[in-house]
Structures are given as structure tokens and as C-alpha cells.
Amino acid sequence: MLRAIAAAKKKNDRIDANKICDCLRCDFLPVCYMASTAIRERRRTLRYRNLLVRQMVQMKTKICTLLMAAGVSYDKERLHKAGYFRELLANNPDINDGLRSLLKLCRETLVRLSKTESALVRSLERDPLLMERVKRLMSIPAVGPITALTWALEVGEVQRFSSIKKAISYCGLCGDQKSSGNTVQRTPLSKQRNKHLQTTLIEAAKMAPRYNPTLAQLYNRERQKGNVNRATLAVARKLVAYLMAVDRGQTHFLVLDNEERAAA
């Protein structure tokens, strides 16, 4: 109906309002979930933290760009460490006064952003509304504070998902399909998703096989099929299943041995 309104030949506010009212009267409009005010405020803080992280990356990239533009050689693995950076500015003859002032400004901005980001994360971890929930989620191997906070604040009430498949779809970890006649197009990931959750879960899935043997087996099994990205997505989907189970049951994550699984 809404697509018909958008493509109508005669279109004005009165006609559109009448059509929308008819849809509402017939219960054709889907219900939109709205998180509580407390969750929205804390989610705003977490998303602001993500902005600070992007700015930190920009500052690090700018420092590297300035050094390369001036032909200064440096150790990229130690560049952003405080001691090495001070030594580089003090002893390298290729760095003139103008470049040195810009590099110091970038470094000061980077340190300030890092301190602010750490303070925001600590404040969310110590929040009484989130503390117990985050601790339970962090009991899952490979789930750290950022992944736990992102899940808790972006999902809100986990009971609104009736199945794991719906949660996976909300996180954007499934493909999209567009078909017309005999033509079927599939995309690796759907664009209709929560992009904050999608990014965090994919990044967590890249590190998860190092900390969780079960996820490592899943990753290796999927990787043998020839696609590394599909293996990462499979791990991310399994993480969603773990997060939903812990969040719904309100219990810590338990790892069962093979003997206990057989007995169960």
C-alpha cells in the first residue's frame, strides 16, 4: 500500500493520509519496536564512543601520512607507542619544526580521544542497569565488553525475537534475495539490518576462533569449503545463538565436555 502511495499518479497529503488511516484501521501497518528511554540514552553514549574510535583511526592514519609525505622512515608497529613517538620526534633529522608541531597536535588529539573513549566504556560497564547483563554476556568465550554492550543496547529486549533466525536477520548476517521472473539475485549480506550490531559481530567473529575451540572447529569446517568470509559469517551467526541463549536464560555461559554432552 505504501509503495502504491509513493508511485501514485495523483498524490497529495490528504489522499496519502486517508490511505495510511485505512491501513492503520485494518491493522496493515507493522508494529515498530521502541526501546525505553534509559536504553536509548545509553545507546547514544555507545554510538558516540564508536565515533571517537573512528576519529582515533583517522588521527593514526594522518600521522602516518604526514611522516610518509616527508620521507621519514619509522617502525609502523611501534609508531603509536608514546616512548617511540617521542624518540622519533626528538632524534629524526628529517622532521622539521613545522612537521613536528603538527605531529604533536595529532598525538595530543589521539591521546585525548583515547582517554575519553575509555571513560565512556567504563561508565557503561559500571552502569547498574547494564552491569549484570553485560557480565553474563561476557561469560561467553570471545565476547568482550564492547560486543556485550553493543548487543545489550542495540537489541534492548531480547524477548522481541521469537527465533534465532529473526535475530540473525536483524543483525544483517543473512543474505538478501531479489527475484523477477526467472532471474534470482542473491547478495552476501542484507542492507536491511542494524549496522552497528552487524559490524561489531563480524569483528568479534574474526577473533572468536582464537578463544573458543567450538567456534574454531566451525570456522575451519566452513573455511574448507573455500570461502573465508562465509566462515566468518557462520561464526557470527553462532555468536548470535550464544548471546540469545544467555540473554534469554539470564544465566552464565556453560561449556560442556564431550562426556557431559553424551550423558545429557
Task: Give the location of each predicted region.
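Conserved phosphate/pyrophosphate-binding and hydrolysis machinery centered on Walker-type P-loop NTPases
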Residues: 10, 38, 75-78, 103-107, ...
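Short helix-capping/linker segments at secondary-structure and domain boundaries
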Residues: 28-30, 59-63, 117-118, 156-160, ...
